[in-house]
């Protein structure tokens, strides 16, 4: 989280209130160099970007020059170069988590707010010291850990409820009285 004099209690990060022109400049400064670096360090991205003039990707409009990698192709790419299709710039075993998603797709995960979800939870009103009840699954998919890590980043304690065991979950909810629920609307309806 970046903080400076313009930081206020409404925004989690000063990036949210940054002048749009400054943000655009910051986002695209050295963008082509970053893409080139990723392409050099990642076999998967090197294959995908091999016919793209990376030095020409310097502003938002240039993003249309990049090929789209469809989710339906990701499984095939990953099978040809396990675990993550060569689409990371560090060794696959260096990540803290290896998630599996439907369609035989594997996703890396790391500690902290790896998915940058803290901004969303903060915008929803979550603050340091809140007790959060997280009913997203912690089994194979990333949602449970994704939300827990984001809430922890803000300074919240998390009850990792997951799904199922409704009777036990109701006991926990009644005893702990969390200030936030994270999960699907359908499971919330069951709990209510």
Model regions and ranges:
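Well-ordered alpha-helical segments embedded in enzymatic catalytic cores
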Residues: 116-120, 168, 187-190
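Alpha-helix N-cap/helix-start capping motif
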Residues: 42-43, 163, 185-186
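Short, flexible loop segments at the rims of nucleotide/cofactor-binding pockets, characterized by
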Residues: 15, 109-111, 136, 156-161
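Nucleotide 5′-phosphate-binding alpha/beta core
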Residues: 1-123, 127
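Adenylate-forming
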Residues: 179-192
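ATP-dependent adenylate-forming carboxylate-activation enzymes
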Residues: 158-173
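Active-site charged/polar residues at nucleotide-handling catalytic sites that mediate phosphoryl
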Residues: 176
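Conserved AMP-binding loop of ANL adenylate-forming enzymes
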Residues: 118, 122-158
